[in-house]
Curated annotation (Swiss-Prot):
Enzyme class label: hydrolase
Function: Catalyzes the deformylation of 4-deoxy-4-formamido-L-arabinose-phosphoundecaprenol to 4-amino-4-deoxy-L-arabinose-phosphoundecaprenol. The modified arabinose is attached to lipid A and is required for resistance to polymyxin and cationic antimicrobial peptides.
Similarity comment text for this entry: Belongs to the polysaccharide deacetylase family. ArnD deformylase subfamily.
GO biological process, one term: lipopolysaccharide biosynthetic process
Domain NodB homology, residue spans: 2-260
E.C. number: 3.5.1.n3
The protein's annotated pathway: Glycolipid biosynthesis; 4-amino-4-deoxy-alpha-L-arabinose undecaprenyl phosphate biosynthesis; 4-amino-4-deoxy-alpha-L-arabinose undecaprenyl phosphate from UDP-4-deoxy-4-formamido-beta-L-arabinose and undecaprenyl phosphate: step 2/2; Bacterial outer membrane biogenesis; lipopolysaccharide biosynthesis
Protein name per Swiss-Prot or TrEMBL: Probable 4-deoxy-4-formamido-L-arabinose-phosphoundecaprenol deformylase ArnD
GO molecular function, one term: hydrolase activity, acting on carbon-nitrogen (but not peptide) bonds, in linear amides
Gene Ontology, cellular component aspect: membrane
Keyword field: Antibiotic resistance, Hydrolase, Lipid A biosynthesis, Lipid biosynthesis, Lipid metabolism, Lipopolysaccharide biosynthesis
SUPFAM superfamilies registered for this protein in UniProt: Glycoside hydrolase/deacetylase
Domain of life: Bacteria
């Protein structure tokens, strides 16, 4: 059996309200547990519309048919009106997810983090983490043990900012295998579990269609030479593409692929993990910079 970490990002009000319940039902049907990373503050995702002036982002919107995929309520959220508080308005749903799955912090304000985290100082980074952490721990009535920044917008500054919160692990970057990030003083920080596989919106329309996506991603899992981690989004696989996602899980089981929460990918002895850093980089299909794993050779 090939073990794959299944990460579910929840970015918006609609993704929480509609997508998460669908995904909980699908996962229960297939007997699978996953890790949900949830956004709990204001839903301002519609403010990303200004990025349409950037050719790469515009092409992504066009090839993924974003309006039909996400819905106009997501694409316009927080533009003409204040963004709704996701956690406060959907606490029962988030709590239900935590009853059966690992739940970690994604963001307080997903839009703000994705847009400004690259220039915020440490105090501002810590403020947003604290806001999200306090809200989420109150909702699920237990400590939050893991986190994953919005849009993989992370570097060594973000790694440092998270150190005081005592997470068991973070999943802030793209890469190949879990590692221990080296801090500026030479010590090692909280373990990172990178995402290794592409997401739906990164590849659809780039030679990959809705019809052959499941086959594409299963083949990529089999080709993965590291520790495979796959990310889906409640706004996509939990709503419009939920039938496709259920079919993916069925196909995976038939082909000897099993999914698990990210924490189950960690070894008992974390000191056996390689050392590395989170550096800014780029990947095909995603506009702008994002955190990438850089392993340190001994």
């Amino acid at each position: 059996m090939r073990k794959v970490g299944l990460r579910i990002d929840v970015d918006t009000w609609r993704g929480t309200q509609q997508g998460v319940p669908h995904l909980l039902e699908i996962l229960s049907l297939h007997g699978i547990q996953a890790t949900f990373f949830v956004s709990v503050g204001p839903d301002n995702m519609g403010r990303h519309l200004w990025r349409l002036v950037k050719p790469q982002f515009l092409w992504k919107i066009l090839r993924s048919k974003a309006a039909s995929l996400y819905g106009w309520d997501i694409l316009l959220a927080g533009t003409a009106w204040p963004g709704r508080q996701i956690g406060a308005g959907n606490a029962d749903i988030i709590s239900a997810a935590a009853d059966h799955h690992e739940v970690g912090l994604h963001a307080w304000d997903h839009f703000a983090w994705q847009t400004w985290a690259g220039v915020w100082d440490n105090a501002h980074l810590e403020k947003h983490i604290r806001l999200g952490l306090d809200s989420l721990s109150q909702i699920i009535e237990q400590p939050v043990t893991c986190s994953a920044v919005a849009g993989w917008r992370a570097d060594q500054r973000v790694v440092k900012a998270k150190e005081s919160f005592g997470f068991r692990y973070n999943s802030d970057c793209r890469g190949t295998t879990p590692f221990r990030p080296v801090l500026a003083d030479g010590s090692t920080g909280t373990v990172q579990i990178p995402v290794t596989l592409p997401t739906w919106d990164e590849v659809i329309g780039e030679g990959v269609s809705r019809e052959n996506y499941n086959r594409f991603i299963l083949d990529r899992i089999k080709q993965d030479t590291g520790t495979p981690v796959y990310t889906i989004h409640a706004e996509v696989e939990g709503i419009v593409m939920r039938k496709h996602f259920s079919e993916l899980l069925e196909m995976a089981a038939q082909e000897g692929i099993t999914f698990c929460p990210l924490s189950e990918l960690l070894p008992d002895d974390l000191s056996t993990l390689p050392l590395g850093k989170v550096v800014r980089g780029a990947i095909p299909g995603r506009e702008g910079w994002l955190g990438c794993q850089q392993l340190i050779d001994h």
